[in-house]
């Protein structure tokens, strides 16, 4: 009897919530075990001193097929970012973006001293080629590193340094662009076809919405799993849960003995928030810092988009991807 099955999902992030959604459709009543006090995983938002702070600068790309399948975009009250970036060269911001989706970016992009005219033409051609590829074909294409891929396409070192490196370092969370070219093509396609969006009430609105759809799922918060052994789940507080099936929707290496798959090499960044007297961008642009000596990779003003929680001053989000020796 499927209704009597005890199915536990370890992790209340996006993967865990989607797993519960699918199980409910088959009549299963899953139990989600979440180590923290709420759902969301890496998609969390805090309100501190009246400011709305996402835990990490994160955006939702409008053309993510899975997002379109499981989310109601209208209810998220999504705020649009400009389809481009402000790139700081010698301290001066230079606008660079997609004039096909925002005509106001045409002249700034044409005259942007970030690479050659040939580079800009190659970006347009690459965009056209990738839009014609299906996602399935992208992930079947022979892969190299993103860095090698860009050089193979024929981009100059200057455009790679000024645009591709800081932009994709902020996405891949690594500064050498060693990430697979398949992932580069996928992300490039998503940015080329859609827009970067942030929910008005913060990125945590995404998991909150997914949770609201779950009618048969039980949630156990502050329930950290330390070991999964056959039909038993052991929690950090010593509690032992009996289970028929367990879905691990989080880092599994510590809780499962003799895991056949190799340990995951997680990448990370540091996200800092500052208040400032003014926003230096007229519109919601991502700011890129292509300076090798700079600790900062990219910046964004959350106060440049609509929010239900705004403090007295402008809010600046700073992302650090580089490894460093600075302490807290």
What are these regions (language model features)?
Residues 5-32:
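N-terminal Rossmann-like FAD-binding beta1-loop-alpha1 element of flavoenzymes
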Residues 108, 125-227:
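Active-site/ligand-binding neighborhood in enzyme catalytic cores
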Residues 49-137, 146:
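Dinucleotide-binding Rossmann-like beta1-alpha1 core, especially the glycine-rich loop
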Residues 24-48:
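Glycine-rich FAD pyrophosphate-binding loop
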Residues 5, 57, 243-244:
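Local beta-strand N-terminus motif with an aromatic residue
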Residues 26, 224-328:
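Mid-domain catalytic core of redox enzymes
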Residues 15, 38, 253:
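Conserved Rossmann-like nucleotide-cofactor binding loop
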Residues 11, 80-82, 221-223, 229:
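Short loop/edge segments at beta-strand edges and connector loops
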């Amino acid at each position: 009897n499927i209704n009597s099955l005890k199915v536990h999902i370890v992790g209340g992030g996006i993967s865990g919530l989607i797993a519960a959604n699918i199980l409910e459709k088959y009549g299963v009543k899953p139990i989600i075990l979440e180590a923290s006090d709420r759902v969301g995983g890496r998609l969390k938002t805090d309100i501190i001193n009246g400011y709305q702070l996402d835990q990490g600068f994160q955006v939702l790309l409008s053309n993510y097929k899975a997002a379109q399948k499981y989310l109601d975009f209208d209810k998220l009250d999504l705020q649009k970012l400009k389809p481009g970036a402000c790139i700081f060269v010698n301290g001066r911001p230079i606008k660079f973006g997609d004039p096909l989706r925002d005509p106001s970016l045409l002249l700034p992009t044409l005259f942007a001293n970030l690479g050659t005219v040939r580079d800009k033409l190659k970006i347009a051609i690459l965009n056209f080629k990738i839009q014609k590829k299906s996602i399935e074909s992208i992930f079947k294409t022979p892969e190299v590193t993103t860095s090698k891929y860009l050089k193979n396409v024929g981009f100059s070192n200057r455009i790679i340094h000024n645009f591709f490196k800081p932009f994709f370092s902020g996405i891949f969370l690594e500064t050498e662009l060693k990430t697979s070219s398949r992932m580069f093509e996928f992300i490039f396609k998503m940015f080329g076809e859609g827009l970067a969006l942030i929910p008005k009430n913060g990125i945590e609105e995404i998991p909150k919405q997914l949770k609201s759809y779950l009618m048969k799922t039980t949630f156990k918060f502050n329930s950290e799993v330390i070991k999964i052994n056959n039909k038993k789940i052991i929690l950090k507080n010593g509690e032992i849960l009996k289970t028929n099936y367990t879905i691990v929707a989080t880092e599994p290496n510590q809780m499962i003995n003799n895991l056949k798959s190799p340990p995951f090499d997680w990448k990370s960044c540091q996200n800092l928030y500052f208040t400032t007297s003014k926003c230096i961008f007229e519109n919601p642009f991502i700011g890129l810092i292509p300076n090798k000596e700079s600790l900062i990779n990219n910046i964004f003003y959350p106060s440049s988009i609509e929010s239900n929680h705004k403090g007295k001053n402008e809010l600046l989000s700073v992302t650090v991807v580089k490894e460093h020796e600075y302490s807290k």
